[in-house]
Amino acid sequence: METLVAGSIFMVLVSGVLAIIIYMLPWFIALMRGSKSTVGIFFASLLFNWSIIGWFITFIWSIAGETKKSAQPNQVIIIREKE
């Protein structure tokens, strides 16, 4: 009986952790991509991911949004040797 209870508690904890990871997946993607809108995606995820539509909107925002690297202008540095 104790094994059954311990196994049930373990499954509830694992399920809860997986649910949180899936719920916040758009924010994790934004963090990994270095998105400029990481804070906005975080709060939008907290508020709207309970609905499937909100989750898909934040997911698309996280994968299509501008990253910090792409926002910087391209710079070319030319170094010449002295003759």
Swiss-Prot record:
The portions of this protein that span the membrane are 3-32, 37-65
Q: Cellular component terms, GO, for this chain's entry?
A: host cell plasma membrane; membrane
Q: How does it sit in the membrane?
A: Multi-pass membrane protein
Report the protein name in the record: Immunity protein
User: Which regions form coiled coils?
Assistant: none
Q: Where in the cell is it found?
A: Host cell inner membrane
Q: Which InterPro entries match?
A: Phage_imm (IPR016410)
What keywords are annotated for this sequence in UniProt?
A: Host cell inner membrane, Host cell membrane, Host membrane, Host-virus interaction, Membrane, Superinfection exclusion, Transmembrane, Transmembrane helix
Q: What is the annotated role of this protein in its UniProt record?
A: Inhibits of the DNA ejection of T4 into the host cytoplasm. By this means, T4 excludes superinfection by the phages of the same family.
Q: Does the keyword Hydrolase apply?
A: no
Q: Which gene encodes it?
A: imm
Which superkingdom?
Viruses
- Keyword Plastid appears in the UniProt entry: no
Per the UniProt topology annotation, the Cytoplasmic ranges are: 66-83
GO terms (BP aspect): superinfection exclusion
